[in-house]
From Swiss-Prot:
The active site is at 177 (proton acceptor). The keyword NAD applies. It is an enzyme of class 1 (oxidoreductase). Its EC number is 1.1.1.37. Belongs to the LDH/MDH superfamily. MDH type 3 family. The lineage of its organism: Bacteria, Pseudomonadati, Pseudomonadota, Alphaproteobacteria, Rickettsiales. InterPro entries: L-lactate/malate_DH, Lactate/malate_DH_C, Lactate/malate_DH_N, Lactate_DH/Glyco_Ohase_4_C, Malate_DH_type3, NAD(P)-bd_dom_sf. One of its GO terms (biological process) is lactate metabolic process. Signal peptide: none annotated. Keywords: NAD, Oxidoreductase, Tricarboxylic acid cycle. Gene3D superfamilies: Lactate dehydrogenase/glycoside hydrolase, family 4, C-terminal, NAD(P)-binding Rossmann-like Domain. Catalyzes the reversible oxidation of malate to oxaloacetate. One of its GO terms (molecular function) is L-lactate dehydrogenase activity. This is Malate dehydrogenase.
Length: 313
């Protein structure tokens, strides 16, 4: 009998709870849901477990506040941290969430040093670097969830504007997870037809694409302003689980994620959103695209912003 993979979710808030549910739906493995709020972790785990007879999914799930329970986890997704309130930027979260990540990273190093770690906590590009520095895990075993979500938002907005299925749209967003992300129009298409060609065909205007790019950059902020008391969690959870699935099942999907760069794109010792291939060995390849002068300028501005944010961690 094949042993189930052990997946630890650190943080049982909206995103953590949704990730746990999606993992069960997809039968990806057994789940440990950890939170300092013991009751929340145990309550959500029990609620999900009680849905198993209806959903016909197998595997164990339990909640805890004890880091020892993540021992020998195959993969870990970190969502713990305070979330944004209206008017608050991701950057406002830094001081509090770095301390949270530091504690988590120390315990991952102690109990699950061989795990593949996906960081979701914002501000993403700062938190994933903090995870790397404090856990001392290999750089190929730590990634941040950002580009998958940003690309999904961009694809959705394009699909709605063109009145086509979201399944027809492919897009790619690089750079930091914030206002200076870089949606790559040249690498975005609808059933193989580039956005540039769709503009030429009159199916969408350049101004509308520019508007969609800006809406994508403000995608998280838009949801925060609507919810008033929280931030997005359905799409972030789906994004993290897609990355997890690629690792656990060696799918080798090429996905835009925050990954550690060692000279690629001219960047050293930072986690930045770029296309990577995720397989059983973690980050198996960083795909280095040739950017235009304009794209490179935006990308470098994004990198500079990340450098400023991580200066004091």
């Amino acid at each position: 009998m094949i042993q189930s993979k052990k997946i630890a979710l650190i943080g049982s808030g909206n995103i953590g709870g949704m990730i746990a549910y999606l993992i069960r739906l997809k039968n990806l493995g057994d789940v440990v849901l950890l939170d300092i709020n013991d009751g929340m972790a145990k309550g959500k785990a029990l609620d999900i477990a009680e849905s198993s007879p209806i959903g016909k999914y197998n595997g164990e799930i339990f909640g805890t506040n004890n880091y020892a329970d993540i021992e020998n986890a195959d993969a870990i997704i970190v969502t713990a941290g305070i979330t944004r309130k209206p008017g608050m930027s991701r950057d406002d979260l830094i001081s509090t969430n770095v301390n949270i990540i530091k504690e988590i990273a120390t315990n991952i190093a102690k109990y699950a040093p061989n795990a593949f770690v996906i960081v979701v906590t914002n501000p993403l590009d700062v938190m994933v670097l903090a995870m790397y520095r404090y856990s001392h895990l290999p750089s190929n075993m730590i990634v941040g969830m950002a580009g998958v979500l940003d690309s999904a938002r961009f694809s959705y907005f394009i699909a709605k504007e063109l009145n086509v299925s979201v399944e027809s749209v492919d897009s790619l967003v690089l750079g930091g997870h914030g206002d200076i992300m870089l949606p790559l129009i040249r690498y975005s298409s609808v059933s193989g037809v580039s956005i540039a060609d769709l503009i030429k065909l009159g199916m969408i205007t350049h101004d509308k694409v520019t508007e969609i790019v800006e809406r994508t950059r403000k995608g998280g902020e838009e949801i925060v302003s609507l919810l008033k008391t929280g931030s997005a969690y359905y799409a972030p959870a789906e994004s993290a689980v897609l990355m997890l699935d690629s690792y656990l099942n060696d799918k080798k999907l090429m996905l835009p994620c925050s990954a550690y760069l060692k000279g690629e794109y001219g960047v050293h010792d930072l986690f930045v959103g770029v296309p990577i291939i995720i397989g059983k060995n973690g980050v198996e390849k960083i795909v280095e695209l040739q950017l235009t002068e304009e794209e490179n300028s935006i990308f470098n501005n994004s990198v500079a912003l990340i450098q400023n944010l991580v200066a004091n961690i």
